[in-house]
Amino acid sequence: MSAEGEPAEAVAETPANSPGEEAAAAAATTDVDVREEQRPEKQSLSASMCRESHWKCLLLSILMFVCLGAVTWCQVTSVTKLSFDSSLKGRSMIYHGSPCSDGYVYIPLAFLAMLYVVYLVECWHCHAKSELQNKADISSVHDQIQRMRQATPCIWWKAISYHFVRRTRQVTRYRHGDAYTTTQVYHERVNTHVAEAEFEYSHCGIKDISKDLLDLERHPATKLKFTKCFSFANVESENSYLTQRARFFTEIEGLDDYMEAREGMQLKNVDFKELVVAYVDLEKQPWYVSHYAFWVAALFMLSWPLRVFIEYRTAHVHYHIEKLLGLEYTASSTGDEPIYRFRMPRVSTLDSTELEWHICTNRQLIPSYSEAVLMDLTDASLCNGYSSCGYRGVLQACEGCNRASSSSSIFSRHAIHSCSGGPSHLSLSTSRFSLCQLHGSHRTGLWRSRSSSLADRGCQDERCCSYSSQLALNENPPTYHDARFFPVLIVHRQEGCQTRNFCLHRSSCMETSL
């Protein structure tokens, strides 16, 4: 009774914790990282045979033992033979002898010698492959794991824009002993643009959640396979990753016909090795992994059993280096994010017969940045009602053009408004679709436009004729980015024209017609 009462008294004398202290203790417990544990697994004999079968060595060993069995059978077995001798006046003679006495024993011996040479070559290849493995002791492995845990990840993307070029070459072929030259057509890949980027996760926060690796010293040898991966703690950080990734590939998507996308994760300032064999003591390895044991077993054609035994005595573990993103996520302001302009890729127009025909038959010259800067500033009074007309261009006729043809004009994204306040006058005979870059929305819209003849809205209009041979430029030339991605396209017409009338496009639209 007294023994049971003493603890009760001790409990009664212990002061109760205040609510503030309990909350602090709970917070401290929460802050402590509780990591999961991972241990190497020793596999069974059948599992080790399935993991590393060494089927080449096994097949060669079986064939060599079959040849040895055939030679042994020739030496041990005795059969009854019947022979005729002419010196004995045609009498037959019965005797016992080896079934391979007539030279048949050399057939399995020849096969055995050939297979033995191939077997030794395979053993040398396996030994060289084993020597190339990364070997380390347990302390070095733990240090390497600690460095990978503390390393900062780099989640990268890489995009390669390319197209195929049709080429020809002369090839010499032979037929019935005669040499002749033919022309071979082949397609060669040409890389035109390579871009790289990485995920900006400074607003997400990062934490390593890899498991604790224990009990490596309990096994004489352990094969470790390392894998890098990352995960997200919340939906916001995942959306940030997907948004940056989509923006990067969208920027590169339309630069050429095809795009090769790559992505991955690297650990900065860490020499990452995927496969490592860890020993308790690197200087004193087990006897069965020594060079002498391997080659002695190979000479006696016992290399395959030794390999299975080594695999059986080796433990395996697949260790993941995992980084968790989004623990300290803070929403980034819209102004800090870079502005991406989504352009229509080349392959997106393949389903449109009209746009495809227009792309193949256009006659356009894109001025360079230097040419755009050196253009004269003329007639600034054209732009009334809009202070900054933007980077504009006019259709300049080549030495006379009499009939309307298909043309397109892609202007600056600042030219969505009409400078004169009136409707734009287009020089197209029949306008079906307009693919416009909306100012301020960074989106591409596709809608139907009105269809009319050239006589209704043609260059006979006085306002249109008054704009002839005019080039409206703002005082400040465009930036290099605008000049590159939003050029002024000047359409040159091939056929003659009696009147030198010009039509000014005042919208950043691409007009097409059949």
Swiss-Prot record:
InterPro entries associated with the record: Tmem151
Signal peptide bounds: none
Pfam families: TMEM151
Region (Disordered): 1-40
Keyword field: Membrane, Transmembrane, Transmembrane helix
A GO CC term assigned to this protein in UniProt: membrane
Protein name, entry field: Transmembrane protein 151B
Subcellular location(s) per record: Membrane
Matching PANTHER family: TRANSMEMBRANE PROTEIN 151 HOMOLOG, TRANSMEMBRANE PROTEIN 151B
Protein family: Belongs to the TMEM151 family.
Membrane topology label: Multi-pass membrane protein
Listed transmembrane segments: 57-77, 104-124, 286-306
